[in-house]
């Protein structure tokens, strides 16, 4: 027996937890395959890494250059490695115990790209390679700017071979070659290009050769003079416009007019030095997934600083920038880790693959109506969401842990170099956000196929957009950081950003032999920003999911609080409806039922389990169609212990009535009470005492019949011995106990067995109210009779509302019947009363040859002048004879008389059946509706 009162929150949570654990046990291999996905993907990375190592990392081009040298002069050579034996690319990997000092160089445009317009010079200089290099000035003090611009280029070229670097530091040297990743070898010096000396004017014979560097890194370079041209601009806007128009996409002609640098002196004066420098930052990261290159900015800073010092102290004051020099380094090897290079997009896909799994599971229960049937049997929203969330969180956590373990075991630097606890914390908060998003999205989908397509588009779209759009903008220095923050509000990009930071730290750590990201550097990376975004979005998604679910359950529009309804308009509309109702004709029995309901509404008694008072349901019109009145005005009272049957043609409104009573839709007007509880306000409490047998079986294919009943029994607060006893009795009563049928998966049941299980589910726990929609559909005669007995026994302490198309079923089970046509009760009473009221005639059937049809009709009319022929085809005729005008013996006499005059093949006399009553009432009601 059930405990007194409904099941508690934790009892219901325990019920669904046990059901889910059993369900997952049946699907254990699906879960194993899901958790093994990271392993398979990590193995793919291992093979890619091995291929990359053989072709790239271990290539001779990516190692320090070596030659076989005869050091002892004995004809035997020894393999010797060093910078002197290396190409420019190989030199990066060589040991450099004493790095070379190199003179600092300024980056200037190549001759064919130097700035050219009417303010500078004509285009003939490009043909002669003699265009000057341009430096722009602006600021608040034009005269000060003129002095500083002159000081930049006032020094004549001077050389002192005894101290070459000191001598070169007195000059302004430049190159057209961009910087490398390091300064171990300066590309401007080791290349074949010339070194340029920027002068105010280039005198004759100003080009010569010079030797730079120490053996073995000694290079002879051509020193060429290039004219420097300083130009003043009124403000920074003009400078920005000029720089932009010098870009080949910044002007309509596609011309390139590059400027060396630009200086904004702001409010610089004798006591304040404040300067802003424009330089071309695109050279820093023009090669994606490569280390940043050195940008030649320090010499630009030193250049203008010297000009300012000379403005203050005179031309002899100098602050020399003699050289740039790297720190010593050991020999290294190329150690490019594929997992770190492609980690952001790869692991974005790996982690996001959980989203379709979660979303499909939620939408499947929604599509198959499993969630609503659980709710109808007492499972509240709270236990459902908490247990579902906990399950998906556990599954996702195992998935992430296995991903980290597999990645570490096979040696992926992405996992080994970054702090494990930091990684897990990031993944953990994100999978919580992902589960919340899946819950939120599940409200937008009703079909698994649609949800699956949308989810996979999100997965792969997020990875591709992250790599080709978000990462491009992230690495571009010109893109505003605030817009990066806005983009990170998209969950796919916040995940990508976190993985990008992990990959960059692992890549740099592996390249330099250091660790990756650690907690102590948490605030130094954007990872802290991403953490905060994910946590906030996690809670926002949970709140939004709760709100949408509550609004959907209550039937309210999501934006109901924005809608302002006109009370006068509503009351006027109701007045019109009431006046329309008042002129409709109602039968006396229906009026008596309405009066009984009105009396019950005034009383506080709960003797009647179900009370419906003027219940209406109108569906709004769509596509220009008028509103559909599914249930017009329904007043009904069903006491406990009664089975009330609803008969009616398709579209009569029976299903809409059941949907209102089970909470699927809200009534348009009127009221309904179950055990004294209002279905519009207390539906969650109503569910705890309700059982439902839907028209279509809503079962889990992998759960057994016993497991179904155990789950629903727990929802009805059955425990221990009472639970097991109730389950066993239910299985026996519907003939699902013997032969091991109870422990077979429901997916292997026949249609009839599933139907019997659905009836058993609706009756377990002795619910106070049960709704059954065609419970015996698809059953063989023996099973049908057995099931009817079960239902009849169950109604002793239960109010049952049953819909059926079987008149035999209705007559056997129902204490009272109501015939429903066009949304309205046409009659109500027990089967005998209805047959007596609407069936006051006998039906005589007689089959003869066609030529005797008129003779038969004349003989029957002799018995009663009010006889009515209701059927006629190929010699077979049916006549309806009023009972009050004829005796049965008189009918027999007519038959005997007919037999004596002609051959009668067959005949029969029957009382009116319930089916005849149903047809008669339905036709009369439909005819009246058409007429009205």
UniProtKB/Swiss-Prot annotation:
ABC transporter domain location: 610-847
Signal peptide start-end: none
SMART domains: AAA
Main location: membrane
GO molecular function list: ABC-type transporter activity; ATP binding; ATP hydrolysis activity
Transmembrane intervals: 34-54, 338-358, 392-412, 424-444, 453-473, 483-500, 526-546
Domain of life of the native organism: Eukaryota
Pfam families, alphabetized: ABC2_membrane_3 (PF12698), ABC_tran (PF00005), ABCA12_C (PF24526)
UniProt keyword annotations, A-Z: ATP-binding, Membrane, Nucleotide-binding, Transmembrane, Transmembrane helix, Transport
GO cellular component terms given for this protein: membrane
Protein's membrane topology: Multi-pass membrane protein
Cellular localisation: Membrane
Sequence positions that bind ATP: 648-655
Family indicated by similarity: Belongs to the ABC transporter superfamily. ABCA family. CPR flippase (TC 3.A.1.211) subfamily.
Protein name: ABC transporter A family member 3
Species for this entry: Arabidopsis thaliana
Higher taxonomy: Eukaryota, Viridiplantae, Streptophyta, Embryophyta, Tracheophyta
């Amino acid at each position: 027996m059930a405990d007194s009162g409904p099941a508690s929150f934790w009892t219901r949570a325990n019920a669904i937890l046990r059901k889910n654990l059993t369900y997952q046990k049946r699907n254990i291999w699906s879960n194993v395959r899901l958790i093994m996905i990271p392993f398979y993907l990590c193995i793919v990375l291992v093979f890619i890494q091995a291929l990359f190592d053989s072709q790239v990392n271990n290539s001779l081009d990516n190692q320090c250059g070596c030659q076989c040298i005869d050091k002892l002069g004995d004809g035997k050579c020894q393999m010797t490695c060093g910078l002197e034996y290396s190409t420019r690319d190989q030199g990066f990997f060589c040991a450099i115990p004493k790095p070379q000092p190199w003179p600092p160089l300024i980056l200037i445009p190549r001759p064919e790209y130097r700035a050219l317009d009417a303010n500078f010079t004509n285009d003939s200089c490009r043909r002669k390679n003699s265009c000057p290099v341009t430096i722009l000035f602006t600021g608040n003090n034009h005269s000060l700017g003129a002095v500083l611009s002159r000081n930049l280029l006032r020094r004549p070229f001077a050389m002192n071979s005894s101290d070459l670097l000191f001598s070169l530091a007195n000059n302004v040297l430049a190159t057209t070659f961009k910087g490398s990743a390091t300064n171990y070898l300066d590309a401007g010096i080791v290349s074949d290009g010339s070194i340029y000396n920027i002068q105010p004017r280039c005198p004759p014979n100003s080009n010569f050769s010079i030797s730079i560097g120490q053996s073995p890194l000694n290079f002879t370079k051509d020193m060429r003079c290039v004219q420097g041209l300083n130009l003043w601009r009124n403000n920074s806007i003009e400078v920005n416009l000029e720089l932009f128009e010098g870009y080949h996409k910044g002007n309509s002609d596609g011309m390139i007019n590059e400027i060396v640098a630009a200086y904004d002196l702001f409010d610089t004066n004798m006591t304040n030095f404040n300067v802003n420098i424009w330089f071309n930052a695109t050279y820093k990261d023009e090669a994606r997934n490569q280390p940043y290159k050195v940008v030649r900015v320090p010499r630009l800073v030193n250049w203008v600083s010297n000009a300012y010092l000379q403005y203050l102290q005179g031309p002899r004051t100098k602050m020399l920038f003699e050289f740039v020099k790297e720190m010593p380094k050991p020999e290294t090897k190329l150690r490019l880790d594929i997992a770190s290079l492609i980690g952001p997009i790869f692991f974005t896909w790996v982690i996001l693959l959980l989203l379709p799994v979660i979303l499909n599971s939620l939408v499947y229960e929604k599509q198959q109506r499993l969630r609503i049937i659980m709710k109808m049997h007492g499972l509240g929203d709270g236990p459902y969401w908490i247990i579902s969330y906990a399950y998906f969180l556990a599954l996702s956590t195992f998935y992430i842990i296995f991903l980290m373990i597999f990645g570490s075991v096979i040696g992926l630097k992405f996992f080994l170099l970054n702090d494990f606890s930091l990684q897990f914390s990031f993944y953990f908060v994100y999978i919580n956000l992902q589960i919340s998003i899946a819950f939120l999205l599940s409200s937008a989908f009703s079909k698994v196929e649609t949800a699956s397509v949308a989810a996979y588009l999100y997965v792969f779209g997020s990875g591709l957009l992250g790599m080709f759009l978000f990462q491009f903008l992230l690495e571009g220095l010109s893109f505003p950081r605030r817009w990066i923050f806005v983009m990170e509000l998209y969950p796919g990009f916040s995940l990508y950003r976190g993985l990008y930071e992990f990959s960059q730290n692992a890549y740099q750590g592996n390249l330099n032999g250091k660790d990756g990201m650690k907690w102590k550097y948490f605030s130094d990376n954007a990872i802290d920003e991403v953490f905060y975004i994910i946590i906030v979005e996690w809670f926002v998604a949970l709140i939004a999911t709760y709100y949408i679910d509550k609004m959907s359950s209550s039937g309210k529009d999501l934006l109901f609080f924005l809608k302002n309804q006109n009370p006068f308009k509503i009351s006027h509309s109701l007045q019109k409806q009431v006046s329309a109702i008042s002129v409709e004709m109602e039968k006396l029995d229906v009026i008596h039922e309405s009066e009984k309901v009105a009396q019950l509404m005034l009383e506080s008694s709960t003797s009647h389990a179900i009370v419906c008072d003027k219940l209406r349901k109108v569906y709004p019109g769509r596509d220009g169609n008028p509103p559909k009145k599914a249930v017009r005005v329904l007043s009904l009272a069903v006491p406990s212990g009664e089975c009330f049957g609803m008969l009616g043609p398709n579209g009569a409104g029976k299903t809409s009535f059941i949907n209102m009573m089970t909470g699927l839709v809200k009534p348009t007007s009127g009221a309904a009470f179950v055990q004294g509880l209002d279905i519009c306000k207390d539906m969650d409490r109503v569910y705890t005492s309700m059982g439902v047998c839907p028209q279509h079986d809503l079962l889990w294919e992998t759960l057994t019949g016993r497991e179904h009943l155990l789950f629903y029994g727990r929802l009805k607060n059955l425990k221990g011995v009472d639970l097991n006893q109730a389950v066993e009795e239910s299985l026996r009563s519907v003939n699902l106990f013997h032969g091991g049928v109870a422990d077979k998966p429901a997916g292997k049941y026949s249609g009839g067995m599933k139907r019997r299980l659905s009836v058993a589910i609706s009756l377990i726990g002795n619910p106070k109210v049960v709704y059954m929609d065609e419970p015996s559909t698809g059953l063989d005669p023996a099973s049908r009779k057995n099931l009817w007995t079960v239902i009849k026994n169950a109604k002793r302490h239960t109010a049952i509302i049953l819909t059926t198309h079987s008149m035999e079923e209705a007559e056997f089970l129902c204490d009272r019947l109501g015939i429903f046509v066009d949304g309205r009760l046409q009659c109500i009473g027990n089967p005998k009363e209805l047959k007596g009221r609407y069936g006051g005639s006998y039906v005589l059937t007689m089959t003869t040859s066609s030529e005797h049809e008129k003779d038969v009709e004349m003989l029957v009319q002799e018995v009663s002048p009010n006889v009515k022929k209701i059927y006629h085809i190929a010699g077979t005729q049916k006549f309806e004879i009023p009972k009050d005008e004829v005796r049965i013996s008189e009918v027999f006499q007519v038959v005997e008389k007919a037999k004596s005059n002609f051959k009668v093949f067959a005949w029969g006399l029957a009382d009116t059946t319930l089916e005849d009553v149903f047809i008669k009432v339905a036709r009369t009601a439909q005819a009246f509706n058409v007429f009205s």
